A protein has these predicted regions:
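N-terminal signal peptide
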Residues: 23-47
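Extracellular leucine-rich repeat
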Residues: 39, 49-83, 87-97, 101-105, ...
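Residue-level marker for the onset of beta-strands and adjacent loop->beta junctions
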Residues: 4-5, 98, 106, 146, ...
Length: 331
């Protein structure tokens, strides 16, 4: 993966912000993977103008669709942990999940010790937790899966902790998949269109696109996977996978780590997958983490995904950086 350049956002305002809503629309792809854009304050108007342009009707108040079902998990059995999910479950060593993933619920807390990873490296594999207590990721702790949905009183990602759904998307929505047609190695689409290096007769490069934009109706509660990049071969699939989905819901989120839903890279024979979806909802959020739902690189870049951050109040300490590749980052 290419170089990541974190960009600090302006310092938080020195007062309580009322229901600060940051909607990040990840823009159209060019030859490069498309970058994410965080909109704040005045820039928010611009974001909404895009919606108007697309004849968009506002969604009902955020209703949280249930994550895909997965079998109920136990602390010792599924997570190799110590304790139980109705009091406190501590996972001391890394675990590789089998099957479709895990659904974790209980009245207790969950803690991944420093450096521990919970991995389910299959497209669309679910790691879902809904706990009354806390969820804590120690330093360098990781969760890797296609759909990661965590709800708890507090969620804490320690330094260098990572939630990574890169290229692990399950199936995109039915009607408009965003997956490019043909064998031109085009990029997948989602928040933006994928790029294409193939120019149709009578069209210019600027008019040539890969996969389509989709999922306009869930801008505030994005829940779509990114789509796959195209291939240059009918026999072999060289396209990068789409980015997955990450949802985090808590009263307080401490984000010192990284949340990633990037599309996969397609290499020289396939298009990049498009970015997936990230939705964070909290009363307060602090820390200095990174959030990324970029399209993957490839013969043609994948479109960006969607990021929605719905935070009532940002702690004085909260700062966030964006990490997409491409020259756009230097803007
Ligand atoms: C969890 O807490 C709720 C509400 O306090 C209670 O009704 C439920 O029985 C508890 N569940 C367990 C497994 O302790
Ligand atoms: C978590 O579980 C509670 C109680 O079962 C439920 O009310 C709530 O909607 C769940 N939250 C999410 C995000 O699924
Ligand atoms: C969540 O965090 C708050 C503020 O740091 C703390 O007061 C509270 O006890 C935490 N909740 C739990 C369940 O640990
Ligand atoms: C998060 O980062 C802040 C600032 O560096 C630090 O004060 C805090 O202890 C960190 N928290 C965790 C859980 O790593």
């Amino acid at each position: 993966m290419a170089h990541h350049i974190p960009l600090p956002l302006p310092l938080p305002l020195r007062r309580r912000l009322h229901h600060l809503f940051i909607l990040a629309l990840l823009a159209v792809a060019s030859g490069n993977p498309s970058p994410g854009v965080y909109d704040r304050g005045a820039e928010e108007a611009e974001a909404y103008s895009i919606l108007t342009f697309h004849d968009y009707t506002p969604p009902p108040p955020p209703a949280l669709p249930p994550p895909p079902a997965a079998p109920a998990a136990t602390c010792a059995g599924d997570l190799g942990g110590v304790g139980d999910l109705d009091t406190r479950c501590v996972v001391p060593v890394s675990v590789r999940l089998e099957g479709g993933g895990v659904f974790i619920s209980g009245n207790g807390s969950l803690q991944l010790l420093d450096g521990v990873s919970v991995t389910c490296q299959r497209p669309g594999c679910v790691v879902s937790a809904n706990l009354s207590g806390d969820i804590r990721f120690g330093h360098g702790a990781r969760v890797v899966a296609g759909w990661v949905s965590l709800a708890a009183t507090n969620i804490t990602l320690g330094d260098d902790a990572v939630i990574d759904t890169t290229a692990l998307a399950g199936n995109p929505p039915d009607k408009t998949s965003g997956v490019p047609t043909g064998i031109y190695g085009d990029g997948g689409g989602h928040g933006g269109r994928g790029a294409s290096c193939y120019v149709n007769k009578g069209q210019t490069q600027e008019d040539s696109w890969g996969g389509d934009t989709y999922a306009w109706s869930e801008l505030k509660t994005p829940n779509s996977y990114g789509s796959k990049g195209g291939s240059t071969s009918v026999e072999k699939d060289y396209g990068g996978g789409g980015g997955g989905v990450v949802w985090l819901f808590a009263d307080e989120i401490v984000m010192n780590g990284t949340v990633i839903a990037n599309g996969g890279n397609g290499g020289t024979k396939g298009g990049g997958g498009s970015g997936g979806s990230i939705y964070l909802k909290a009363a307060t959020m602090q820390g200095g983490g990174k959030i990324s739902a970029c399209g993957g690189n490839g013969l043609s870049g994948g479109g960006g995904g969607r990021v929605s951050i719905d935070v009532f109040s940002r702690g004085e300490e909260f700062r966030m950086s964006r990490q997409c590749r491409s020259s756009w980052d230097t803007l």
